[in-house]
Amino acid sequence: MKAQPKASHFIDGEYVEDTAGTVIESIYPATGEVIARLHAATPDIVEKAIAAAKRAQPEWAAMSPTARGRILKRAAEIMRERNRELSELETLDTGKPIQETIVADPTSGADSFEFFGGIAAAALNGDYIPLGGDFAYTKRVPLGVCVGIGAWNYPQQIACWKGAPALAAGNSMVFKPSENTPLGALKIAEILIEAGLPKGLYNVIQGDRSTGPLLVNHPDVAKVSLTGSVPTGKKVAAAAAAELKHVTMELGGKSPLIVFDDADLESAIGGAMLGNFYSTGQVCSNGTRVFVQRKIKDAFLARLKERTEAIVIGDPMDEATQLGPMVSKAQRDKVLSYIEQGKAEGARLVTGGGIPNAVNTEGTYIQPTVFADVTDEMTIAREEIFGPVMCVLDFDDEAEVVARANATEFGLSAGVFTADLTRAHRVVDQLEAGTLWINTYNLAPVEIPFGGSKQSGFGRENSVAALNHYTELKTVYVGMGKVEAPY
């Protein structure tokens, strides 16, 4: 098989197999071909991974942040040297076009290792607090063994986004990728060892829904970071809360993207397309509710239709391809079901809505789809679809659109397109979301915090904020005189 790894798991610096685990077949979404066959972690594999992480962590934490950072920065260099190889693996794993993966997947993972490797020494400093004759100081200390649970839309990126800050702060990690995309994280673990990371600090185990609870409920795990769905997030949060474990989670969204009538039309349409069709719509922060001011609605839709129908759908390994298949048949069928529901509830289909011609019929392809005349009550405007389905809604004024944009259980992201920056800042101040964009969309460089509010989770990926989530504050009071006691 074209992408078969040496074994299913990577524990304590080496590949490990246990064929007693449930079989996981890695399927190339473009052809339906089985490209690798792995096994889910048994309870014994879970124990081995956590034991390795627990054993290795204290010595790693005792190293200077500069020394830890040097290893992470070397991992970033190796990832960049092998960007093509890693990008092709990511395309096989996810079905995303090589045109995307070569600029957005391993590269963002490398950015994460480089960034956290570079800031560890400075960002982990504490404070000195003078108290007259006495004084106190604070220091940030690692949590211990951390668990990362990944999603299938950006498997390599997520493996790095969770691993880099955890390791920079002096923790160890056990990472479980999605069973849909099991391959990329194994390569990240390999590269970290090559970069000089001591064995046991970054372990990868495969698994399904039964594996997560074994990790989350383990008494030696101090922290859990999840990227996934809201229902999964609630289960993980409840389990972590029962043991008072640290937890951060980046969950789903149904984000608003607001286009005022003074916006640059081409830029706004480009932002809406990036916020709906990139990665075949499988991005949690997508602006899938596109609110367009009524005055420009017709012009917006006409040009959007032209540009959408010009998207090149095809072989993900062809660098001309702009839209690949969905990650799995189950996900494609789910999206097609939402499209049928949209039509049944009265939304107007502008373009797309089906399976494209002239592609591999065994692949899980779907047309980029645009609905107009969508109302707030429709299912496609309320529920996360996680596919290339854009809902265009009309609005008249600012107060109306802000209220409607906020009328959702989610709060991951939002975007505003307008030539009036005063209005843009006024609107984003009112929008209930964790990550917002003005006159652009879905850019998430490692330097800025990324995360949501409401049902979209809590905590932040990236930036110094992420590093803080992998540490806790220790306060030390130093008495400089004799103790006076009334006893």
Curated annotation (Swiss-Prot):
One of its GO terms (molecular function) is betaine-aldehyde dehydrogenase (NAD+) activity. K(+) 2 binds at residues 244, 454, 457. It is an enzyme of class 1 (oxidoreductase). Pathway: Amine and polyamine biosynthesis; betaine biosynthesis via choline pathway; betaine from betaine aldehyde: step 1/1. InterPro entries: Ald_DH/histidinol_DH, Ald_DH_C, Ald_DH_CS_CYS, Ald_DH_CS_GLU, Ald_DH_N, Aldehyde_DH_dom, BADH. It catalyses: betaine aldehyde + NAD(+) + H2O = glycine betaine + NADH + 2 H(+). Binds 2 potassium ions per subunit. This is Betaine aldehyde dehydrogenase. It comes from Sinorhizobium fredii (strain NBRC 101917 / NGR234). The lineage of its organism: Bacteria, Pseudomonadati, Pseudomonadota, Alphaproteobacteria, Hyphomicrobiales. The gene is betB.
